[in-house]
């Protein structure tokens, strides 16, 4: 019992001590007021690649974060509360990576700083909205239970401002979610060239922005002070805000034992909406609701994205005819152009449609009277004509002499007697009918009046002599001739053919019935009385022009001013004159080399063609380019394609030229548009596809993009290939190990265009030079261009320079009149060095000879093993040829030959062409083989001392027998023409004009030797032979 009383005080003391320990521990826990701070660090392309070496600006951001972590120190408030820190961090680009979750400070300070220091930048796009929402998630799942003590520090440059859809709902949505949760967001800039509007959106309000800066380019004291001030200001703001939360009461003693349960309190205020829960399963469909009231008209929505191309609309109606435009001012008369070249003879055309008959021609001259034609075949007898009315009785004429007894007519059959008819009245005279079929012989009628003689018809064109026809029947009796003198009564002739039927006379009275046979016809009666004059005939044809009369005396002046008479009718065409004598032989027409020279002067610039080509555009689509600059770059590509199509006539179609575009960002972020794609049918489809390219806004892996271009868009081809690489020259070479010279090769030319980015940085020339293959051993060197801004891409001058560079290897026709030798050839140029030439003119011929020699020695050969050799010799009098025979040789080295020509001195003596030809003939027989073509080009005016045409003919024929073909150059008008013809043809008797045109060259003066393309003409004809 005593033991129990002794132990009881000890037990009570132990219980009291335990109670004090528990209360003490609770008091300590209550004194901590935790604050959660989470860093959101931007390591996108616009930050990582802004400074060299790449990642330097990210290192500054990491340095800022570590300095900030070092400043997170606990603080004791007067309310007996301690501020303690929980800190964490993430970094982001187009993906988000947690550096370290919320960690208790200061115990986890070193681990957090080490994790920040080990960050490797992403260097791609910028998804700030996703990063903020990930930071909110980290703050909510750990740390303090007080939402008022949770803070987010977003360190970014704010890029990009626009141009692509942020995948996590957008920046404003993320910031509004933070405000809704009561989490404050500080916005800290990476300066300069940050986007203040975006940073202002990120900050909870303007007090959380305050021009805070986390990194600056400069290393000055001011920059360090600004960063230190940023850290101190943010920490002080958090401490002040937290004090109001942690010290919401003055003092609080240790807690006592729990009291009795209190009464239920009043209903509290409505709490803040909770976080959105997970998406539930779809419920059963509800029944249709009642029709609601008509809603108010909503506000105008934001502008939608560009719609797809609509279907082709219906064909429009034909428009009204436009008004006639105002006539333009007449232009000035242009300069006289070069004469056009004769075109090739066209193929015969199809027979045209027969044209309408032409107008009646002028009457031809009267032809000579043709010979009497042979008798034609008997015509069919015409139908009997109507009887004309008898004319008025004429005056009795003088009795004519008795006519010759007519031939007895055929005996006719006796006709039946007709009944006497009544006498009819005289009818109108009808037109003469065609002769009818001969009828039976009628009763003898009364003699009709004699008709007027008709007018003579025009003489017809004599016809071709026809074949002899069959003997025709006996013709009718001819017209009655004029009465001749009375002749002797002749014996009765044979019975003649019946005469033409006369006009039907009036019916006579019935006679007594006959009773005998019909007698022979009586003699013709006397001519009747002369009838009245006939109607006037039509106007006859004009007669032949008479001989020119003598000039008459001048008439008296007529002072009356009469009106001018009507212009007379066009006269008849005179007879064709005799053929004139043949004209002189005209000068030779332009040679082929002269024609090519004319063509080159007229249209060589417009005939050079650009293409076919393969042009590739490699377009930087990284974040540092910016949306507006990316759109300008696409317009530049379209304008280049248009200029090549219109100005350079490049045809972008299958089998011709090809174009392609590659846009790129970071690794595996490439997209291309290719004219070889099945959905791109023409250049218009290609341009539409380029317009639809969307800005990627990521990192910059230029080497990988160039490798992609070579693998996908550079198949083997014979076309000229050129690649235009448009970039800011800041490829992430630390992570992109593909060399920038991947396109360098002998089959492609690379042009790099470097442009300042959105931060105003000048493009890196070192990368641009490597891209364009400059200073490299492999590949053809390209061109590197640097521009201040993307707007300069659309400058007209720059576009013109780019298209000129693309088409620098134009395919132009060859107007140089090239020459080719089909066999080995030895050519000697024989220069006249006599006194008649003169020293100045001799120097001119030496220059001309060197031009010819250069053309000969550089000419093409059908077989490279066949040699062309040239020798130049000057001559004057007898025995005066230089170089001498010992030094003379054929040369193939132009430099040596030109030096020997330059060393020639003017001889200035007599002229002996025969001796010069004999010298060259001996030289060829000794130094030239038999299979080699031997040609001599001789300068001469045909004058030779003491030489005759026969002597020259002998010398030329001797050279021809040695196989030498002679060409002659004649300078000036003072020439011996007969001797020149003998030098050309080797004949004194005749001259072949065609042969002379090929072997004779006439020049007006020595200066003309060096003008134009005469040296090409001469060398070509000598080469062809």
UniProtKB/Swiss-Prot annotation:
The positions flagged as glycosylation sites are 211, 515, 536, 801, 893
PTM note = Prolines at the third position of the tripeptide repeating unit (G-X-Y) are hydroxylated in some or all of the chains.
Q: Where is this region: Triple-helical region?
A: 256-591
Family annotation (CDD domains):
vWA_collagen_alpha_1-VI-type (cd01480)
Give the PROSITE patterns listed for this entry: VWFA
Q: What stretch or stretches form a coiled coil here?
A: none
Lineage: superkingdom = Eukaryota
List the SUPFAM superfamilies.
Answer: vWA-like (SSF53300)
Indicate what this protein is called per its UniProt record.
Collagen alpha-1(VI) chain
Corresponding gene?
A: Col6a1
